[in-house]
């Protein structure tokens, strides 16, 4: 599987996990983590690897259902310890909720023992790995993240993970190697635009999307329809637009993973109105004690809704920040307000240096990319 943005350097970095310890990809929703995981799977398959892929966001429901989903992803022909533990996990998972914890433990032992099948090495690829904590509410699995981490650490090669919550992952598995997904550069976006036959400045597209592939893809689709960038951004950020819906989903997910739902919305609104505020300034704006605001900020930092630099607070996802300013205030944003926001955003874009633009174009000439 390949996406519309060729990220060969990142793919090469990820592929190093085929002969090393587990590697965790991190980044906000829409950063391209899943696309890169699938690109790695395809690259490994061309080299003779078999893969076991599981999306824990969908699979980590009840213990027995989780185990059955994971077992269904295993290849036929397993032998030795891996096969024995897989049979045990299957038997226990069919015993109902009383055996759920033991079934999960048997599955984790299966993963730890996966090595080869029919002479082909096995890659274990787990998307949204921190979702394993969804099982912690079931009997016997309160600390399920510990044996999960131990099972992964026992694998000498071919283990790839991804998460939208790097703060949670660092707390659970501090020794896990990580690779943060960087935003797309203006040059990369310029190159992709040229492959689509578009004349658009990469810096403007980078400003409009903050470099995140999900947003950039939406905007490029509209540009292909002949729409100007500011108009495309405003149209897709209007209620029901794809930018608006993507941000709304991310906003709700982050709040549900955080704590203090109502007041956390107020904190996000304050930071959206003015980034770079410190604790003292936020206390004044929100009318709560420093201790209370510090707690809310800590919870939002923990789910990577916000980041901090020199004790000042910023959004991880700049497009989400603008969505909060426009749509999280209780009244409907007008078309004029949304378009003005788009124009203000694009006014901050620095032109892409000519040499960089030419280099980007040459890298993409003759390439056809599909999603």
Protein language model features and the residues they cover:
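Conserved NTP-binding/hydrolysis module of P-loop NTPases
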Residues: 61-90
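N-terminal pre-P-loop "Q-motif" helix
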Residues: 2-14
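Walker A/P-loop nucleotide-binding motif
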Residues: 21-38
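Amphipathic alpha-helical "lid/sensor" segments that cap RecA-like P-loop NTPase cores
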Residues: 198-249, 266, 310
């Amino acid at each position: 599987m390949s996406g519309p943005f060729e990220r060969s350097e990142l793919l090469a970095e990820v592929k190093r996990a085929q002969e090393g310890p587990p590697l965790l990809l991190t980044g906000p929703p829409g950063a391209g983590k899943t696309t890169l995981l699938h690109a790695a799977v395809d690259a490994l398959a061309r080299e003779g690897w078999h893969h076991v892929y599981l999306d824990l966001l969908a699979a980590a429901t009840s213990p027995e259902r989780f185990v059955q989903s994971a077992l269904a992803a295993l290849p036929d022909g397993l032998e030795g310890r891996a096969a024995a533990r897989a049979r045990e996990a299957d038997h226990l998972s069919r015993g109902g909720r009383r055996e759920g914890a033991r079934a999960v433990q048997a599955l984790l032992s299966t993963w730890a023992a996966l090595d080869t099948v029919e002479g082909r090495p096995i890659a274990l690829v787990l998307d949204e790995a921190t979702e394993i904590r969804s099982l912690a509410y079931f009997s016997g699995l309160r600390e399920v993240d510990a044996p999960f981490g131990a099972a992964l650490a026992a694998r000498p090669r071919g283990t790839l993970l991804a998460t939208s919550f790097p703060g949670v992952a660092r707390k659970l598995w501090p020794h896990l190697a990580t690779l943060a997904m960087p935003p797309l550069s203006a040059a990369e976006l310029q190159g992709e635009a040229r492959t689509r036959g578009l004349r658009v400045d990469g810096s403007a597209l980078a400003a409009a999307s903050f470099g995140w592939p999900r947003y950039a893809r939406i905007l490029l689709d509209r540009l292909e329809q002949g729409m100007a960038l500011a108009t495309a951004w405003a149209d897709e950020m209007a209620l029901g637009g794809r930018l608006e819906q993507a941000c709304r989903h991310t906003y709700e997910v982050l709040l549900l993973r955080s704590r203090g739902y109502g007041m956390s919305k107020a904190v996000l609104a304050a930071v959206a109105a003015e980034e770079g505020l410190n604790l003292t300034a936020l206390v004044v704006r929100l009318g709560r004690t420093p201790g209370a605001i510090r707690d809310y900020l800590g919870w939002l930092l923990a789910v990577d809704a916000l980041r901090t630099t020199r004790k000042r607070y910023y959004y991880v996802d700049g497009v989400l920040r603008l969505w909060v300013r426009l749509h999280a205030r209780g009244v409907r944003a007008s078309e004029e307000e949304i378009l003005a926001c788009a124009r203000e955003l694009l006014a901050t874009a620095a032109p892409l240096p000519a040499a960089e633009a030419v280099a980007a174009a040459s890298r993409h000439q003759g390439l056809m990319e599909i999603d």
